[in-house]
């Protein structure tokens, strides 16, 4: 047995092979732009070409391009197909001419393949099958060739990359928004109200009269220093100590016309947080004139949460807050949690927060937004990075 490899054997791929030549009852009309175009019988037919015997008086040369019309008879109906052929071989002895199809359209190729395949398998070709073959897509799309001389231009690639990057950024932003919304819904508790609270002391009007402040708002006043002066009538000063003779109308009118002035002093080393009565305005006895804040008094933040957030605002819980008018985000710790009202049941909880950084007394009364975040913390990672000097 000879197992030697024959070097002359060439293996073709299936895409390079053509149908075998078959003898099929078909005719070819040679188009020569004349009314009496000759009609010849096809000797051999394949998917790549055909052969016929040239009629007398016609001579063809190799390489010549001729036009013709293939004619088939199917279900007693004629099927014609215009083709363009190139002469590849000419037998002068027998007059046989071998031609190769040129520039066949996709429908023509599909029809030829269907006729040849049906003939080889012994099936009877019907007109319905031919029409069905012409209606469907019998060819796959050409693959994209990756090369420098094909594909998109540099501008086209830039546009594609820009569009893809834009879609990616929009998708990333949408994912971030959804993640933030879900995180805030399940892991973040917001206070319904909050303010900066500082222990204050009220200074009241000793007598009825008009007021004139001596210390501006947010100004400092030492203990015993004058805060304001007031003017009142003599009648107000002597009220309660007048006898029967002093109650005469003329005497009362005289006392009312006399004015006396007095001075109010600061009861502590304080800062004037608020002035509740404007200069030159009348104030009744006992009315609160000033609210004083002890100097260097620790400021805290008071906030109100709903009772459903009971487990989120326990003493010792870390919170973050932002004071109105500031961009800085501060942190603190809840030191107490009480019911909003001591006399009845309430749906709100009042918490007191001790800030990590001291607050200025000028911030007293400002609204505060308080947030309790109970989600996974990465503070340990930040502390480790700061310790490493990153």
Swiss-Prot record:
<dbReference type="Pfam" id="PF07238">
    <property type="entry name" value="PilZ"/>
</dbReference>
<comment type="function">
    <text>Required for alginate biosynthesis.</text>
</comment>
<comment type="pathway">
    <text>Glycan biosynthesis; alginate biosynthesis.</text>
</comment>
<dbReference type="GO" id="GO:0035438">
    <property type="term" value="F:cyclic-di-GMP binding"/>
</dbReference>
<feature type="domain" description="PilZ">
    <location>
        <begin position="16"/>
        <end position="117"/>
    </location>
</feature>
<dbReference type="InterPro" id="IPR050739">
    <property type="entry name" value="MFP"/>
</dbReference>
<dbReference type="GO" id="GO:0042121">
    <property type="term" value="P:alginic acid biosynthetic process"/>
</dbReference>
<dbReference type="GO" id="GO:0042597">
    <property type="term" value="C:periplasmic space"/>
</dbReference>
<protein>
    <recommendedName>
        <fullName>Alginate biosynthesis protein Alg44</fullName>
    </recommendedName>
</protein>
<dbReference type="Pfam" id="PF13437">
    <property type="entry name" value="HlyD_3"/>
</dbReference>
<dbReference type="InterPro" id="IPR009875">
    <property type="entry name" value="PilZ_domain"/>
</dbReference>
<comment type="similarity">
    <text>Belongs to the Alg44 family.</text>
</comment>
<keyword id="KW-0016">Alginate biosynthesis</keyword>
<keyword id="KW-0574">Periplasm</keyword>
């Amino acid at each position: 047995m000879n197992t030697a490899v024959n070097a002359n054997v060439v293996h073709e791929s299936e895409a390079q092979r053509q149908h075998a030549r078959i003898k099929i009852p078909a005719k070819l009309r040679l188009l020569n732009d004349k009314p009496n175009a000759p009609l010849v019988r096809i000797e051999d037919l394949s998917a790549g070409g055909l052969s016929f015997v040239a009629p007398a008086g016609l001579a063809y040369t190799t390489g010549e391009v001729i036009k013709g019309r293939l004619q088939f008879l199917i279900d007693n109906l004629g099927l014609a197909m215009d083709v363009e052929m190139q002469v590849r071989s000419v037998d002068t002895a027998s007059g046989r001419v071998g031609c190769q199809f040129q520039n066949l359209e996709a429908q023509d190729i599909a029809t030829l393949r269907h006729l040849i395949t049906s003939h080889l398998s012994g099936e009877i070709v019907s007109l319905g099958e031919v029409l069905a073959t012409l209606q469907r897509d019998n060819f796959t799309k050409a693959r994209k060739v990756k090369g420098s001389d094909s594909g998109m231009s540099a501008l086209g690639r830039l546009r594609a990359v820009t569009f893809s990057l834009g879609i990616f950024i929009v998708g990333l932003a949408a994912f971030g928004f959804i993640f933030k919304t879900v995180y805030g819904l399940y892991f973040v508790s917001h206070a319904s109200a909050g303010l900066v609270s500082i222990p204050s002391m009220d200074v009241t009007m000793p007598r009825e009269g008009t007021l004139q402040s001596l210390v501006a708002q947010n100004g400092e006043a030492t203990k015993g220093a004058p805060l304001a002066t007031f003017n009142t009538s003599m009648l107000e000063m002597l009220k309660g100590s007048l006898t029967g003779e002093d109650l005469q109308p003329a005497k009362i009118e005289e006392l009312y016309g006399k004015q006396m002035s007095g001075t109010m002093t600061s009861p502590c080393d304080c800062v004037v947080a608020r002035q509740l009565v404007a200069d030159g305005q009348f104030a009744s006895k006992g009315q609160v004139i000033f609210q004083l804040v002890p100097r260097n008094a620790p400021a805290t933040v008071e906030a109100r949460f709903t009772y459903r957030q009971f487990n989120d605002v326990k003493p010792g819980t870390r919170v973050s807050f932002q004071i109105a008018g500031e961009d800085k985000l501060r942190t603190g710790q809840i030191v107490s949690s009480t019911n909003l009202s001591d006399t009845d049941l309430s749906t709100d909880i009042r918490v007191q927060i001790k800030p990590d950084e001291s607050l200025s007394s000028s911030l007293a009364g400002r609204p505060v937004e308080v947030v309790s975040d109970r989600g996974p913390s990465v503070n340990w990672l930040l502390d480790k990075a700061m310790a490493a000097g990153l």
